[in-house]
Amino acid sequence: MKDLLNFLKAQHKTEEFDAIKIGLASPDMIRSWSFGEVKKPETINYRTFKPERDGLFCARIFGPVKDYECLCGKYKRLKHRGVICEKCGVEVTQTKVRRDRMGHIELASPVAHIWFLKSLPSRIGLLMDMPLRDIERVLYFEMYVVTEPGMTDLERGQMLTEEEYLDRLEEWGDEFTAKMGAEAIKDLLASMDLPAEAEQMREELDTTNSETKRKKLTKRLKLVEAFVASGNKPEWMILTVLPVLPPDLRPLVPLDGGRFATSDLNDLYRRVINRNNRLKRLLELAAPDIIVRNEKRMLQESVDALLDNGRRGRAITGSNKRPLKSLADMIKGKQGRFRQNLLGKRVDYSGRSVITVGPYLRLHQCGLPKKMALELFKPFIYSKLETRGLATTIKAAKKMVEREEAVVWDILDEVIREHPVLLNRAPTLHRLGIQAFEPVLIEGKAIQLHPLVCAAYNADFDGDQMAVHVPLTLEAQLEARTLMMSTNNILSPASGDPIIVPSQDVVLGLYYMTREKINAKGEGMYLTGPAEAEKAYRTKTAELHARVKVRITETIKHENGKLTTETKMIDTTVGRAMLWQIVPKGLPYSLVNQKLGKKQISNLLNEAYRKLGLKDTVIFADQIMYTGFAYAALSGVSVGIDDMVVPAAKYTEIAEAEEEVREIQEQFQSGLVTAGERYNKVIDIWASTNDRVAKAMMENLSSEQVINRQGEQEKQESFNSIYMMADSGARGSAAQIRQLAGMRGLMARPDGSIIETPITANFKEGLNVLQYFISTHGARKGLADTALKTANSGYLTRRLVDVAQDVVVTEHDCGTLEGVVMTPHIEGGDVKVALTELALGRVVSEDILKPGTDEVLIPRNTLLDEKWCKVINDNSVDQIKVRSVVTCDSDFGCCAQCYGRDLARGHLVNQGEAVGVIAAQSIGEPGTQLTMRTFHIGGAASTAAAENSIQAKNNGSVKLHNAKFVTNKDGKLVITSRASELTIIDEFGRTKEKHKLPYGSMLSKADGDAVAAGETVANWEAHTMPIITEVAGRVQFVDMIDGVTVSRQTDDLTGLSSSEVTEAAARPAAGKDMRPAIKLVDANGKDVLIPGTDMPAQYFLPGKAIVNLDDGAEVNVGDTLARIPQKSGGNKDITGGLPRVADLFEARKPKEPAILAEHSGTVSFGKETKGKRRLIITRDSGDTYEEMIPKHRQLNVFEGERIERGDVIADGPESPHDILRLRGIHAVTTYIANEVQEVYRLQGVKINDKHIETIVRQMLRKCTITFAGDSEFLPGETVEYSQVKIANRKLVEEGKEPARFERELLGITKASLATESFISAASFQETTRVLTEAAVSGKRDDLRGLKENVIVGRLIPAGTGFAYHQDRQAKRAQEQQGPSAEQATDNLAALLNAGFSSDDE
C-alpha cells in the first residue's frame, strides 16, 4: 500500500509553490543533487550504442536507456521496478529519469565561475574590493596574491610578481602565504568577515563627504548586505564541484552512416573532464609547478567555455568553425530557453490554411474545410464513435475515420456544433488578432473569414494565411465563447470606437444606395412605407435614387427602457427607405437619411451599440454587410479610363507656372535671389500649381449639370465611379485621384528633400522615361522604410508589453483623492480634442461644480458616460479632475476606479483585467502605420514666417493666465512675464483658443474685454526680444563706454545712432569685468525704485543687445529700452513618427534640452568663465543657487527678474526628467501623453490617453531615497516605489520617522530590467547580467506579474486566473494559522481513498 502511495506521489510531483528563489549552490548542494560522479569523457560505445560506464551518458548514474530494463538485460518488466542490478549497477525504472538526474565532476583544483567574475560589474571584484585586472592575473597564474600576511609587512590581498614573491620568500621564509589561481581567491573570499565589513562601511558612509566614494561604498555595502541576508557564502562563487546536466537534455543521436549528431555541451563537458583527469594525474605524479599551473589554467578556461563560451578570450569553436553553444547561450536570446520554449510554445490541435471571403457567413461564424475539421476534431470523433457503439475500439474508429465513411461526417457535424474554434493571424499585434468563431463545414481547402472582422485582423485575401486552434476543455470553450467570440469584440480596446466597421465594397454599396439623383424615374411619389418603396423599385416604377416622400415609423427608446413610436412623412429617397427596413428599432431615421460614407456608417453602428446593446448591433452589422454587397453588385461601379477626366485648365496652369519658374531662374542668375530662395520659391510655385490643378479636377469630377423636372439646368453630385469610390471612403483618396487625372506633382528624394522638377503628367496620360525614373527614386525608399518599420514597431511593442505586463486591476477602489486635471486640447485657435472626449469613461476625483456656483453637478467617484458628458457640455464645464492610473494608490497593479471604463466593453473595468498588456498593445499595434522618418524642414515649410501676432478666430472674451504687465502711455498692456497665456472664452465660459504670449507683447485688449473673430489681440516683434521698463524716468548709462563695452553706429540715411553691446569675450581687457546697464533716475538724478520693492530700476544688458536711446533720454512705463536679436530657429530636424514615440517612452534626454529653473527666486549673473555664464538664483530665504550655462545658449531671463521653479531659462526641447523633478508627476504625464498623441494624431490613429498613462505609471516605478528616516534604506539608493510606500506605512503606524524620496523616471527598457521579478527581467534582455545579480543577492520572485507565471507554467493572475490566485492567497493566509487536527485526519483519509480508487498501474 505504502509503495503504491509513494509511486502515485512520484507520478504527480507538481508541488504547488508561491515563489521562486535563486541563489548560489554550495559544493555540498551540488553533490546532493548528483547521482554519481562522471569520471570519463567517453559518451557511448560506437558499436553497441550503449553508454560507457562512468562516462557522460552512463546508465548507472543517470538511469536506464529503455523503460524498466537494466543495461545488461538481466531485469526487465515492471515487476522489478526499483531493483538495482548487481551486474551493471543500473536502477530499473522509467527512462525519463534521464531528463532530471544530474551528475557531477570533482574538480582537481577550484575554478572561478565566469559569471561572477566577468559579468560587469564583477561581483567577485566588488566584494573583494580589487580591480578585475588583478583578479584575472591571479586566476590565470600571472601573479601571486598574499592570503595570509602573518608577521610580515605585507598586506592581505597584496599582489606580487614572480620575482617579488621569490624575494619575499628568501626574506621571510614561510612566515606568510601567497598563492595564485582560483585557490588564492577562494581563500581570500572564505576568510572575509562580512558582518564586520558591513559595519565598517556603514561607519565610513557617515563620515565621508566625497560623492564618488559614497556611491562606491553604497554599491559595495548593498552587495555585502545581500550576501549576509541571503545566506550565500562568497566562496561559493568559486567552483570546486561542477554539476553535469542530465543526458537527455544534451542528447547524442546516431545518424545513419555511423556519424553522430550531438549537442555542443557534450563537447564542452568532454574538454573539462579530459583536462581535469590530466590535472589529477599530474598532481599525483608531483609534476613541475609550471606544468601543473598551465593545466590548471586550461581547466579554468574550459570551465569558462562550458558556462559562457566567448565571455573571456576567443570562443572555443567546433569542427565547423562555429562557436560552441554553452549553457549561458541555451537560455538567452530569441532562440534561448525563455523566449523559445517558455514564453512561446507550439501547440497541438491546430492547423493553418489560406483565407478567402465568406460574405454569406454570420458574424460569429467562420468556414472550416471539412478535411481540416476532421483532422482537428479526431479524438472527439473517436470517442463519439465509441460511445455510440459504431466502433468497438479506438483502432476501429481510427480505421473508420481514415476510410471517411458517411457516418463519420454526420458525427463530425455533431461534434462541431457549438464548439468554437480560435482563428489567429500573424502578426498578433493586439488581442483582436485571435478571436473565436463557430465553424461551419465547407468544401475546398481554404478557411472562410467574415469580411467585417478583417479590420481587426488587418487581413486581406491576397494570399494571407490563418491558423486555427481548438479549445479542448470545457473551461476553454466557455472562455472562447464568452470572452473571445467575434460578436463580443465589437469595440476596439485602444479607443473604444467600433472596430467591426464595413469597408470597401459594403461602403460603396450603401453609399450608392443612399445617394439622390435629380429627376430620376419616380421622383415625387408618395409611398406608404419602406415596403412599398421596395415594391416600386423592384417593379422598376421608381429608381433607387429617386426623391420621394415616404411614411416612416420611428421607435424612440427612453432612458427607462420604454419604447414609443412616432410616424411622419419624410422627404427621402427610395434607397434610404429600403435601407430603413434593416435598421433596428430605437434609432432615429435621420441617421439613414443622408448619403452614407464610411464615417456615417461607423457612427450608425456606434449609436446602435450605445443605445441598443450588443445583440441588436451584431445582427444589424451583418444585415448592413449583406445589403452593402448586394447593392454594390447592382450599382455596376467600375473603373474605366474615361472616368478619369483631365481638367482643361491643367495645360494653361502648367504653362503659367513654367513661365514663373523661368523668371525666378533669371533673377537668380542676375544675383537678386540666393540659391536657397530660388529653390524654395520654385517648389512653392509647383506646389500651388498642383493644388490648383487638383482643385479644378475635383470640381470637374464631383459635379455634373442635369435638367430637373422643371426643365432648368441644375448642378448635382456626379455619379462618376472613381469619384464615388473616393467620396464614400471605400477606396482611394483625393490625393490618389489627383495623380490619376491631375498631375503627379513634386517627388521626394530618399533623404526627404524635394526634387524641384515636378512630374507634370498623370497616369492617364502616362509618364515618359525621365518622369518614371524620378518617381522610382523616392518610391524605393518607401519600400525599404516599410520593411524596417515593421521590425522597429515590433520591438517597441515588445518593450512596452514587458514594462507593463504586471499592471492588472487588483482592487475596486484604492481610495486615493489624487487625480489629473483634464482640459480640452487646444492648439492655437482650434479645439483639437474636446474635453468630453478626453474625460469619457473616466472617474471623477472631486465634485464637479456648476460653473460660478457651489452646486454639485457631478459627485466624485462617478464614472463619466455619454450621459454625464452631455451634462458637462451643456453646463460648459472647462476643466475636470479625474482619477488616473498614474496617481493610483494600489501597491501592486491599479484599481478599477482609477482606470475607469473598459473601452472594449463600455462599462467599469473588471478586477483582473490585464490593463497593462492592453495598453502596450494599443500603443504598439498602430506602430506600423507611423512613419519612420526624421522630417527635414525643407521646401515650403521652412519659409513660413515666424508668428508675430495673435488673431482671434472666435467671438468671445479675453482672459490672461499668470501674466504680469504694465500699461504704456498709449494705454496698451505690455507683458513683462515669461510663461503667460492668453485664452479666448465663449459666452458659456468654454475655452475656445489658447495662445502663448511672449515677453514684451503689446495687447490691444485687457483681461475680460470682448473680442470679435478676426481681431488682432496682441502683437510683438518676431526676431528680437525687447527689454521693457516697468518705471518711467530718465535713462542713465552705466559702464557703457564706446569702443570698450559698446560700439556705436550711426545710420547714414536717418542719422539715428544706436549702440550694440559687445560680448564679454570680445572686449578689451579694461572692459572684461564691466557690466553695461541702463539705470532709470528721476529729474534730480536719484534712483527710481521698482514698484513694490526697494531695488533700484537697473536693467543689465547682455551681449549683442542693441540700444536706440541716448543717455539722458526720457522714457515712459512700458517703453522698450533695448532689443536683443534672437537667432531664428534654423533648420532643426524634427524627429517624427515611430522614433519619436520610442524616444519618449525611453525617456531619452534631448541633445540640447531646455534649461529650467531649479528654484524660485531672483536672477543675477556672476563671474563668467571661458565658455560658460554663471547664473545665480537668490531664493526668498536669502541663500543662493548657482548654475553654469554654456554661452551659446540664448537666455530668456534678465538680471534682477523673478522666476518660479520650473520656468524656462533657455529654450529647447524639454527633458522629461527635468519636468518630473521641477514640475511634478502630473506635468510629466501630460507632457508624455500629449507628445505621443501628437504623433498618432498626425496619422489619424485614435488612442485613449489612459493607455499612455498606464505606461508612464510603470516608468515611474522607482524612486531615489533622499532621507532614510528610521527605514532600512540607504540614502541615494533606488528602490521600488511600492516598497517605500509599504515600508513608510509601517513606520508611521509604529510612530517612527518615514523615509523621504524623489520619484525617478526610467525609460521602458530600463524599467523592464529593473522589475522586482528577476524571471521577467531575465526573459526580456541581458539574461546573464540579470541572473548573476539575482543569484548573488539571493532574490526571491513572488510571481506577481503575468510573464513570470507563464514561464513557470501557472495560470496567470489576470482574467479568469485572477480569481484562482486570489483564492490561493486567502488559503495561504489561512494556512499560516495552521490546519486543525480534524482537518489533518480528513486530508489523510482523502489521500488514502484516492490511492485505492485510482485505476492507475
From Swiss-Prot:
**What are the protein's GO molecular function terms?**
DNA binding; DNA-directed RNA polymerase activity; magnesium ion binding; zinc ion binding
Which residues of this UniProt protein bind Mg(2+)? Answer: D460, D462, D464
* E.C. no: 2.7.7.6
Q: Which SMART domains match?
A: RPOLA_N
**Cofactor annotation comment:** Binds 1 Mg(2+) ion per subunit.
Q: Which Pfam families match?
A: RNA_pol_Rpb1_1, RNA_pol_Rpb1_2, RNA_pol_Rpb1_3, RNA_pol_Rpb1_4, RNA_pol_Rpb1_5
The UniProt record gives the binding positions of Zn(2+) 1 as C70, C72, C85, C88
Query: What cofactors does this protein use?
Result: Mg(2+); Zn(2+)
Question: What Gene Ontology biological process does one annotation of this record name?
Answer: DNA-templated transcription
Quaternary structure and partners: The RNAP catalytic core consists of 2 alpha, 1 beta, 1 beta' and 1 omega subunit. When a sigma factor is associated with the core the holoenzyme is formed, which can initiate transcription.
Please give the function described in this protein's UniProt entry: DNA-dependent RNA polymerase catalyzes the transcription of DNA into RNA using the four ribonucleoside triphosphates as substrates.
What this protein is called in its record is: DNA-directed RNA polymerase subunit beta'
Q: Which organism is it from?
A: Vibrio cholerae serotype O1 (strain ATCC 39315 / El Tor Inaba N16961)
